[in-house]
Swiss-Prot record:
GO CC terms, sorted: cytoplasm
SUPFAM superfamilies in the record: S-adenosyl-L-methionine-dependent methyltransferases
Lineage of source species: Bacteria, Pseudomonadati, Pseudomonadota, Gammaproteobacteria, Alteromonadales
Regions crossing the membrane: none
Name of the top EC class for this enzyme: transferase
PANTHER family per UniProt: RIBOSOMAL RNA LARGE SUBUNIT METHYLTRANSFERASE G, RIBOSOMAL RNA SMALL SUBUNIT METHYLTRANSFERASE C
Keyword rRNA-binding: no
Catalytic activity as recorded in UniProt: guanosine(1835) in 23S rRNA + S-adenosyl-L-methionine = N(2)-methylguanosine(1835) in 23S rRNA + S-adenosyl-L-homocysteine + H(+)
UniProt name for this protein: Ribosomal RNA large subunit methyltransferase G
Gene coding for it: rlmG
UniProt cross-references to Gene3D superfamilies, sorted A to Z: Vaccinia Virus protein VP39
EC numbers: 2.1.1.174
Family: Belongs to the methyltransferase superfamily. RlmG family.
Key words of the record: Cytoplasm, Methyltransferase, rRNA processing, S-adenosyl-L-methionine, Transferase
Native source species: Pseudoalteromonas atlantica (strain T6c / ATCC BAA-1087)
Molecular function GO terms recorded: 23S rRNA (guanine(1835)-N(2))-methyltransferase activity; nucleic acid binding
Length: 384
């Protein structure tokens, strides 16, 4: 993994998080980060005293770069990004207090002089952030976004125009592009989030904040797993990578005595999962915990939760930010083995083309296919 960012007479050591699970060809910043850093350095002569707001910094590169400028406000929905920022500030001998770190549920009320946005993969998240910005920007605020050129579509620019004002773009450089926007001082939008839909049989109303995976409908993998939920009455269950919490919610419906731990690395996902328990089964709220974590790191960090769980349900993602990877699923499976009791079960749904069966067999010594269709398989492994 390339770790040294050298640009404009500055040099920083930057790691992706978790560093030990990264491919040697990956790095903690991209050409869009570099383009944004260069543009600001060459076009805004004095950053001292400016209120800087930073959104969607994948692994803390922007946070580190601007950390010496008046404690910029740094907002991300990703717990992994939060951990990466803390790691990279420490590696570069910069106090965490140099950055005002907040999650995506934070509504900024301080006025911004300069807003820097990495365009997220989910346009709904971008839309929510642009709406939120209406309360903290003025026509004098400089708003600059950066992203891969092929990810900046007409629909991306239309969101800036719709919610803020006049929008233009730069030329492409190293396959990245900048977006420049000026707030017109007039637009005040009502957020369309959370989006809501009903589950088929139980008719639960599912609320989904902007960055929740499959926020408009039940995703196919979860649909398959819902038909094969275990009997979990009076057992402790982890809904790992819970998203809006639809699996854990149905566990509580099927097994009223279950205790469910909802875990996700998205702050919006955890907030949505809690909202969905509160709205659909409020009497079960005291049987639930909601934890923002990279896989099960936060559950296992103290060691006291090892071997305490009966069942882990898992619908693993195969992206980290914009990178396709299997390391998240691998860590989820390893963490699941640690947190499960003797004879506890890991139950996984995944695309059939993925190598989950052999990975699980290496860790648990065996696996069983509970069900499968043309696209998905449900795998079960018992901890011995």
């Amino acid at each position: 993994m390339k770790t040294e960012l050298t640009l404009l007479d500055h040099s920083y050591e930057l790691l992706r998080y978790p560093a030990e699970n990264q491919h040697v060809s990956w790095q903690a910043w991209d050409s869009a980060d570099e383009y944004l850093m260069e543009y600001v350095a060459q076009n805004i002569t004095d950053l001292n005293g400016l209120n800087i707001h930073i959104y969607n910094d994948d692994f803390g590169a922007l946070g580190v770069w601007f950390a010496t400028n008046n404690a910029p406000l740094w907002i991300s929905d990703s717990f992994v990004a939060h951990k990466a920022l803390a790691l990279n500030l420490e590696r570069n001998h910069l106090p965490i207090e140099n950055v005002n770190v907040q999650n995506s549920l934070y509504k900024a009320n301080q006025k911004a002089d300069l807003v820097l946005i990495k365009v997220p993969k989910t346009l709904a998240l971008l839309e929510q952030q642009l709406i939120d910005l209406q309360s903290s920007v003025t026509p004098e605020t400089r708003i600059i976004a950066a992203g891969k050129a092929n990810a900046i579509q007409k629909s991306t620019l239309a969101l800036f125009e719709k919610h803020l004002g006049l929008t233009t773009t730069s030329l492409a450089k190293k396959k990245s592009r900048l977006i420049f926007c000026q707030y017109d001082g007039v637009k005040q939008s009502v957020s369309p989030y959370p989006t809501k839909w009903k589950t088929d049989n139980t008719q639960f109303i599912m609320s989904n904040l902007a960055n929740v995976f499959s926020r408009q409908q039940l995703d196919i993998g979860a649909r398959v797993l819902l038909a094969h939920l275990p009997d979990a009455n009076h057992k402790c269950i982890v809904d790992l990578g819970c998203g809006n919490g639809v699996l854990g919610l149905h566990v509580l419906h099927k097994s009223p005595g279950a205790h469910v731990i909802f875990v996700d690395e998205s702050f919006m996902a955890i907030a949505s999962a809690k909202m969905n328990i509160e709205q659909n089964m409020p009497d079960k709220l005291d049987q639930c915990k909601f934890i923002v974590s990279n896989c099960l790191d936060e559950c296992l960090s103290s060691g006291e939760n090892e071997a305490t769980v009966d069942i882990v349900l898992c619908n693993p993602p195969f992206h980290q930010q914009n990178t396709i990877t299997d390391h998240i699923a691998l860590q989820m499976f390893k963490d699941s083995k640690r947190i499960l009791k003797h004879a506890g079960e890991l139950r996984v749904v995944g695309n059939r083309h993925l190598d989950y069966p052999q990975t699980i067999k290496r860790l648990f010594g065996h696996y069983k296919v509970l069900a499968s269709d043309r696209k998905f398989s449900i795998l079960s492994a018992i901890k011995k």
